[in-house]
Amino acid sequence: MKAPIEVSPLAWLDAVEQQRRAAGLRRSLRPRPPVATELDLASNDYLGLSQHPDVIDGGVAALRMWGAGATGSRLVTGDTELHQQFESELADYVGAASGLLFSSGYAANLGAVVGLSGRGALVVSDAYSHASLVDACRLSRARVVVTPHRDVDAVRAALQDRDEERAVVITESVFSTDGALAPLRELHEVCRRHRALLIVDEAHGLGVRGGGRGLVFEAGLAGAPDVVMTTTLSKALGSQGGAVLGPAAVRAHLIDAARTFIFDTGLAPAAVGAARAALGVLRAEPWRSGAVLRHAGVLAEVCRVREAPQSAVVSVILGDPDVAVAAATACLDGGVRVGCFRPPTVPAGTSRLRLTARASLDDAELEVARRVLTDVLAGLG
């Protein structure tokens, strides 16, 4: 009989934490107060709708009518008229034939990619794809080819060389770390020529591009039979949850095949009600998407970013993770909260400040941002 192991099975965590600290990659949680005490340039509340009275009222009304939780999987007791109404309204807004709600954007990506690929298929994914798409590729059991960032020729080569009958190409419409736009028209043409499905994550495009309807709509691909969109309700719509939007056959298939739909509790009614109200505000106030881009331009100019931003995201690359953390801390000390992205979120050597513009920023707030960011960046030398 072997002697019992004396060391705790979690002892290895101490060494891992020390390695993270040494590399400047230790993370911590910083709770925010209910009323912001600093200027928010870090959240994904692009349209400023999370605190909009109509959005809050929409969530409260759904809460009172349907209760706090969905009470089960949507295949059991978790489906409501509210869920199906919002699915139809969101699909109509972006130009898709149908929609299916998930409990998060992460779950929507897992459900769509895994459900529409599988063993015997090829999945081609951009190197800068979000972690949810990376995990979806790993879970798909398909052969996965990762192509350089926004490289259409590499996607074409991967599709040309395949032996698999089915192929899926995955991209974000607006990449979350650098704010760059995917070359959707070119990617779609390559997919069309090689009989591949194009899955586009519109998490950062919805509400910002295409007058609010997203980059797929802007590119003229809305409603295309070989394009599927995923999105989140937690960014421009200021709520929580996710959705897959596309042909009706895709919705029907995912209801039967997407494990993150079948085995997950349905999205809470309050989240659906809030997102539905936010969509109503977006329809009534299309100026919000243009305001986001204008304000992003101001932030980019202040930070001396060379290229004008094409989304709400302004990326200020600083390189060293410790420098990025120090800069973000200095901004917060000055009253401005900014994002700080380090590996593994971004490649090594590209740690950065990630600023996000909001439609609701006013002139006084932009002036505060200008003053604090100018001082902090000047102090870096």
Swiss-Prot record:
Coiled-coil regions, chain positions: none
The enzyme's E.C. designation: 2.3.1.47
GO BP, sorted A to Z: biotin biosynthetic process
Keywords: Acyltransferase, Biotin biosynthesis, Pyridoxal phosphate, Transferase
Residues that hold pyridoxal 5'-phosphate according to the record: 105-106, 176, 201-204, 232-235
Entries under InterPro entries matching the protein: Aminotrans_II_pyridoxalP_BS, Aminotransferase_I/II_large, AON_synthase_class-II, PyrdxlP-dep_Trfase, PyrdxlP-dep_Trfase_major, PyrdxlP-dep_Trfase_small
Superkingdom of origin: Bacteria
Pfam family, one: Aminotran_1_2
Transmembrane segments annotated in the record for this chain: none
Positions that bind substrate: 27, 130, 345
UniProt GO molecular function: 8-amino-7-oxononanoate synthase activity; pyridoxal phosphate binding
Cofactor(s) for this UniProt protein: pyridoxal 5'-phosphate
Catalytic activity as recorded in UniProt: 6-carboxyhexanoyl-[ACP] + L-alanine + H(+) = (8S)-8-amino-7-oxononanoate + holo-[ACP] + CO2
N6-(pyridoxal phosphate)lysine: modified positions: 235
Metabolic or biological pathway: Cofactor biosynthesis; biotin biosynthesis
Family of this protein: Belongs to the class-II pyridoxal-phosphate-dependent aminotransferase family. BioF subfamily.
Assembly: Homodimer.
Biological function: Catalyzes the decarboxylative condensation of pimeloyl-[acyl-carrier protein] and L-alanine to produce 8-amino-7-oxononanoate (AON), [acyl-carrier protein], and carbon dioxide.
Protein name: 8-amino-7-oxononanoate synthase
